[in-house]
């Protein structure tokens, strides 16, 4: 059976359009707020509202999928995000945008949970790594193209909102031509997110998603600041961030394939070790291009491999709940990691960015090494 079936390809095609819209808005909303002369704390609160919506959307989506299936859940998530986009143009103000970004955050998280869950339910333990790698490649390519669009088109609010909303609705079209089956049966009791977080045999996967959130959140949010403080120009900062993200894109497919072939545990150990090496290279002021490249290739691929690891440990009907738990773990890591790291950087040194990344990666490596010797046979999903 082919890994990339027709439903999978159409699902990823729709996701690409949605990711473009998400990337454009996430870049421009803080700039629009600044143009309206809102204070820094107001910009921060609006951003927090979006991420709070992410958490709420993550918690709700499992119930929605169980009630109406993958296709309708995907349509609903897209409509919610489109409403969050269009609503920004109805009234420009702090409280209004606070509410609409919360709505957009819910829709965005629902899209992620639906797509990730559909891919995991479509795959088996033999090809799930490649499916999630394809998902991450589409996500990063969409993010990259979104940034490119921002640099090429008008960024005025009322110029952007119509085509971004249209792009979001266009993301629904591919799914109209296929049906993604929800193979969870009603014979099983509903599985809670809490029970998935407590599942002992999946703990390395859950912890891996938290670590991935800390690493990626810190790199995305604080690397530009680190480079700026080193005297790097804005144009050069864009180049180095492109190197980082490009490495993540290029690393997805080969690492996903290696994880399917040689096992997730071995690949996770190597990835985390390489993240530590990349962090040390950045601290030692070595050649920045290779250091950033290996950091991006290893760091940006942690999430899908850790996710695939955790999903091997559960029954098929538990996959959606497990995916919610993993996305929730990643979100918590991506919120707490940059906040704590930024505080350390402000009070001590900018080098704490890479010391923090290396430290949490080393802790995770110790967890992975403790699992040496005997690894339970994964649950087979056919």
From Swiss-Prot:
<keyword id="KW-0997">Cell inner membrane</keyword>
<keyword id="KW-0812">Transmembrane</keyword>
<dbReference type="InterPro" id="IPR036259">
    <property type="entry name" value="MFS_trans_sf"/>
</dbReference>
<keyword id="KW-1003">Cell membrane</keyword>
<dbReference type="GO" id="GO:0022857">
    <property type="term" value="F:transmembrane transporter activity"/>
</dbReference>
<dbReference type="InterPro" id="IPR020846">
    <property type="entry name" value="MFS_dom"/>
</dbReference>
<feature type="transmembrane region" description="Helical">
    <location>
        <begin position="204"/>
        <end position="224"/>
    </location>
</feature>
<feature type="transmembrane region" description="Helical">
    <location>
        <begin position="235"/>
        <end position="255"/>
    </location>
</feature>
<comment type="similarity">
    <text>Belongs to the major facilitator superfamily. YcaD (TC 2.A.1.26) family.</text>
</comment>
<feature type="transmembrane region" description="Helical">
    <location>
        <begin position="14"/>
        <end position="34"/>
    </location>
</feature>
<feature type="transmembrane region" description="Helical">
    <location>
        <begin position="348"/>
        <end position="368"/>
    </location>
</feature>
<dbReference type="Pfam" id="PF07690">
    <property type="entry name" value="MFS_1"/>
</dbReference>
<feature type="transmembrane region" description="Helical">
    <location>
        <begin position="325"/>
        <end position="345"/>
    </location>
</feature>
<feature type="transmembrane region" description="Helical">
    <location>
        <begin position="157"/>
        <end position="177"/>
    </location>
</feature>
<keyword id="KW-0472">Membrane</keyword>
<feature type="transmembrane region" description="Helical">
    <location>
        <begin position="45"/>
        <end position="65"/>
    </location>
</feature>
<protein>
    <recommendedName>
        <fullName>Uncharacterized MFS-type transporter YcaD</fullName>
    </recommendedName>
</protein>
<dbReference type="InterPro" id="IPR047200">
    <property type="entry name" value="MFS_YcaD-like"/>
</dbReference>
<feature type="transmembrane region" description="Helical">
    <location>
        <begin position="102"/>
        <end position="122"/>
    </location>
</feature>
<feature type="transmembrane region" description="Helical">
    <location>
        <begin position="291"/>
        <end position="311"/>
    </location>
</feature>
<keyword id="KW-1133">Transmembrane helix</keyword>
<dbReference type="InterPro" id="IPR011701">
    <property type="entry name" value="MFS"/>
</dbReference>
<dbReference type="GO" id="GO:0005886">
    <property type="term" value="C:plasma membrane"/>
</dbReference>
<feature type="transmembrane region" description="Helical">
    <location>
        <begin position="270"/>
        <end position="290"/>
    </location>
</feature>
<keyword id="KW-0813">Transport</keyword>
<feature type="transmembrane region" description="Helical">
    <location>
        <begin position="131"/>
        <end position="151"/>
    </location>
</feature>
<feature type="transmembrane region" description="Helical">
    <location>
        <begin position="79"/>
        <end position="99"/>
    </location>
</feature>
<dbReference type="InterPro" id="IPR023745">
    <property type="entry name" value="MFS_YcaD"/>
</dbReference>
């Amino acid at each position: 059976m082919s890994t990339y079936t027709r439903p999978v390809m159409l699902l990823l095609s729709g996701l690409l359009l949605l990711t473009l819209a998400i990337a454009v808005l996430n870049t421009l909303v803080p700039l629009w707020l600044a143009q309206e002369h809102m204070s820094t704390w107001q910009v921060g609160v609006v951003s927090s509202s979006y991420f709070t919506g992410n958490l709420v959307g993550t918690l709700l989506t499992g119930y929605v999928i169980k009630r109406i299936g993958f296709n309708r859940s995907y349509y609903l998530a897209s409509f919610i995000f489109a409403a969050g986009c269009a609503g920004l143009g109805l009234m420009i103000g702090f409280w209004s945008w606070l509410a609409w970004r919360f709505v957009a955050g819910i829709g965005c998280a629902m899209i992620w949970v639906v797509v990730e869950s559909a891919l995991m339910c479509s795959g088996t333990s033999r090809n799930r790594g490649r499916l999630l790698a394809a998902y991450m490649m589409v996500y990063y390519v969409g993010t990259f193209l979104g940034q490119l669009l921002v640099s090429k088109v008008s960024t005025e609010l009322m110029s952007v909102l119509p085509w971004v909303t249209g792009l979001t609705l266009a993301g629904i079209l591919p799914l109209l031509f296929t049906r993604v089956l929800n193979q969870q049966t009603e014979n099983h009791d509903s599985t809670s997110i809490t029970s998935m977080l407590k599942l002992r045999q999946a703990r390395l996967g859950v912890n891996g998603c938290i670590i991935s959130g800390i690493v990626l959140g810190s790199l995305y949010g604080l690397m530009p600041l680190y480079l700026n403080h080193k005297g790097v120009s804005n144009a050069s900062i864009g180049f180095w961030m492109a190197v980082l993200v490009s490495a993540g894109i290029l690393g997805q497919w080969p690492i996903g394939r290696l994880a399917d072939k040689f096992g997730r545990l071995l690949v996770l150990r190597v990835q985390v070790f390489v993240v530590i090496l990349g962090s040390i290279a950045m601290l030692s002021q070595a050649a920045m291009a290779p250091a950033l490249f290996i950091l991006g290739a290893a760091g940006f691929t942690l999430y899908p491999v850790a996710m695939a690891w955790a999903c091997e440990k559960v029954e098929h009907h538990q996959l959606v709940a497990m995916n919610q738990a993993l996305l929730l773990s990643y979100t918590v890591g991506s919120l707490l990691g940059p906040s704590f790291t930024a505080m350390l950087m402000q009070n001590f040194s900018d080098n704490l960015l890479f010391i923090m990344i290396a430290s949490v990666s080393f802790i995770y490596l110790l967890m992975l090494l403790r699992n040496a010797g005997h690894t339970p046979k994964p649950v087979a999903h056919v």
